[in-house]
Amino acid sequence: MLVRYAPGMDTMVALLRGINVGGKHRLPMQDLRDLLAELGCEDVKTYIQSGNAVFRGDADIAALPKLICSAIEERFGFGPQVLVMAASRFESIVAGNPFAGKVADPRSVHVSFLAEEAIAADVERMHSECKDNESFHLTKHALYFHAPDGIGRSAFASKAEKLLGVAATGRNWRTVCKIAEMARD
């Protein structure tokens, strides 16, 4: 199945998990852009090396993660988790940030994009894993996390996905804002 371009279609955002981390699962962004273009995506743009892509196309958005993952696995030998959403959903996640304008340093805010709704999330345990100065907010499509001491020093951050009970991929707030800006262009 190829993605087909159709004027007026929503722009889509793809978030790949676990690529270019610690020298593993190397996927240069030019190669990702080329691969997405070969799949029929139009106006493909990427941001930094962590696997963020914005493109236009006309395809079943639910089928795209598997299509993209399979194409990467065939060409590069590994199949990363891929989340794809309409730019309108991505924008609603950006607009829904409960920490916007409320934290001293927006770099301390992170968003985990959920592959599906976390209906079985262990919210009570999530609260107990947060340090006193940390906080989170869970919605249908995202987990917002404020980590003033840094995400690397947070026990919550390393356990969040397990406690959510669903696959997720995280981005810092600066990256989220840049992807949103790209999707608006």
Show where each model-derived region lies.
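Surface-exposed, charge/polar-rich loops and edge strands
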Residues: 3-185
